[in-house]
Swiss-Prot record:
Originating species: Mesocricetus auratus (Golden hamster)
InterPro entries in UniProt: Chaperone_TCP-1 (IPR017998), Chaperonin_TCP-1_CS (IPR002194), GroEL-like_apical_dom_sf (IPR027409), GROEL-like_equatorial_sf (IPR027413)
Gene3D superfamilies from the UniProt entry: GroEL, GroEL-like equatorial domain
Alphabetical UniProt keywords: ATP-binding, Chaperone, Cytoplasm, Hydrolase, Magnesium, Metal-binding, Nucleotide-binding
Protein known as: T-complex protein 1 subunit beta
GO molecular function annotations of the record: ATP binding; ATP hydrolysis activity; ATP-dependent protein folding chaperone; unfolded protein binding
Amino acid sequence: AGADEERAETARLSSFIGAIAIGDLVKVQDDEVGDGTTSVTVLAAELLRLGGSLADSYLDEGFLLDKKQLIYNYPEQLFGAAGVMAIEHADFAGVERLALVTGGEIASTFDHPELVKGATQQILDEAERQVLLSAAEAAEVILRVDNIIK
């Protein structure tokens, strides 16, 4: 059992070092291109590099987790409150069978966006506003972490 644990720890450390190396490559790309599209990956690499020292700072893990949840789960929470289920990365045949069994409807803009029911411009505007607010929250977190890193 000890040898297995040692191999698992070696594999974990190798992947950690690999992630940092990829982060370094991305940082070079971000410096050269400068368009900001790789900035989040650079941030993630720096957080990996910091390791445990981040836990000792005033910016605790719960704060980051709460903001991540705010960004990624907020639209899902809105759908849930409205009784709508969002399925991501599902095979379409499976979704069709699920809709048939549950009596639900599929809202997809892939083939015929004009057939999607229920979305008014007001709802779409509110959704866009909420996404922008979530993005502002994310930017705030990135700026705060950036201040710690420098």
